[in-house]
Amino acid sequence: MNAICSIARKELQDGLRNRWMLAISLLFVVLAVGIAWFGAAASGQVGFSSIDATVASLTSLATFLIPLIALLLAYDAIVGEDEGGTLLLLLTYPLSRGQLLLGKFLGQGLIPALATILGFGAAAVAIAAMVSDLNLTVLFVAFSRFIVSSILLGWAFMALAYLLSAQAREKSSAAGMALGVWFWFVLVFDLLLLALLVASKGQFSPQLLPWLLLLNPTDIYRQINLNGLNAGNEMTGLLALGQSLPADTLVLWSVLGLWVILLLALAYHRFARRPI
């Protein structure tokens, strides 16, 4: 346990030294406050509209940003150490590969987690301070759900980055694979499901299609945050289809957490067999 904590502390200190957490936090604050006040500018309105609209807009934006940030943070976690010669050095200590992987994941995982809490938490405080007649309980619940689910989404893609890093032999290969999986989960997956739905004229197994959304952590993330919001009544396409999923929110939370565990287990399985 001490070895895991030591590795985690080193990774966190490296992240703080590189100012990743500060940069991500500031980005999230600016985006959240900007969307809250200028999200409806296209319709000629400026100012805070509603909690539901703000969270819905933030969810759509975070679906693109958070996976990309997580992949950029961790794509070289294993292969980078190997190329630099430090991986072999680390493994000469009384430290198993599993301890090394878990320690690095915990340390690096704290960076986007703390940045998400600080960034979006500060935005929620700013909204509460500047908007009168606001239901603070609704604001707290909506942003808490959004922050926790954003952390889980980031961890899922960070675990995926560890799997890619354990598989790749060069950092450039890991970077290319990371970009590829980002395109797949954020853009291509939903487009393929929509194409399937259109090609079948809406007749492709209406019972099966909503369950296919569970194969993409970004779709699970969107369903967690948009289900129950007034903005959810205006959902179209696959998001509207996901509302017919016969599973409650607890199941969605569980599946998103399972994504993190399974991907991290696969990363360990590949790392344990990686030649050094």
Spans of features found by a protein language model:
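A structural motif at transmembrane helix-loop-helix junctions in multipass membrane proteins
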Residues: 151-186, 192-201
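Terminal transmembrane helical anchor/hairpin motif
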Residues: 41-48, 183, 187-253, 257-261, ...
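Start (N-cap) of specific transmembrane helices in multi-pass transporter permeases
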Residues: 10, 14, 99-112, 116, ...
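Aromatic- and glycine-rich beta-strand/loop motifs that create alpha-glucan
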Residues: 1-25
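Secretory targeting signals
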Residues: 34-37, 46-48, 52-63, 107-168
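Long, hydrophobic alpha-helical segments
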Residues: 58-80, 112
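Transmembrane helix boundary and interhelical loop/hinge segments in multi-pass membrane proteins
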Residues: 71-91, 105
